[in-house]
């Protein structure tokens, strides 16, 4: 690397790629909240077919890593819950 390479203008392809990666990361992060809300409602409806539960006792969380997304679901089912026929 020479002293002159510091002052050279960066090529447009790497700059465009970096901007695209930032844009994609932003879109993925913003769309996650809607997905979690939809999944929560669908999970609640499926569980409600079989067991009576309190909707406030169901927690759905999505964590995103660089390579994977993790969906965490916590459902508190009362010990004396009566099963329903599906």
From Swiss-Prot:
**Keyword Iron attached:** no
By its UniProt entry, which InterPro entries does this protein fall under? MinE, MinE_sf
- Cite a single GO BP annotation: cell division
Purpose of the protein? Prevents the cell division inhibition by proteins MinC and MinD at internal division sites while permitting inhibition at polar sites. This ensures cell division at the proper site by restricting the formation of a division septum at the midpoint of the long axis of the cell.
**Organism of origin:** Agrobacterium fabrum (strain C58 / ATCC 33970) (Agrobacterium tumefaciens (strain C58))
Q: One Pfam annotation, family name? A: MinE
Q: Which NCBIfam families match?
A: minE, PRK00296.1
Q: What is this protein called?
A: Cell division topological specificity factor
Entries under HAMAP family matching the protein: MinE (MF_00262)
Q: What is the lineage of its organism?
A: Bacteria, Pseudomonadati, Pseudomonadota, Alphaproteobacteria, Hyphomicrobiales
Name the gene.
Answer: minE
The protein's UniProt keywords, in alphabetical order, are:
Cell cycle, Cell division
Signal recorded as keyword: no
Q: Belongs to which family?
A: Belongs to the MinE family.
């Amino acid at each position: 690397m020479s002293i002159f390479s510091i002052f050279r203008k960066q090529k447009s392809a790497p700059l465009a790629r970096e901007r695209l990666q930032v844009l994609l990361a932003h879109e993925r992060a913003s769309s996650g909240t809607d997905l979690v809300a939809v999944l929560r409602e669908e999970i609640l409806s499926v569980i409600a077919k079989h067991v009576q539960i309190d909707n406030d006792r169901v927690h759905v969380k999505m964590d995103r890593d660089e390579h994977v997304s993790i969906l965490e679901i916590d459902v508190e089912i009362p010990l004396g819950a009566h099963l329903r026929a599906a």
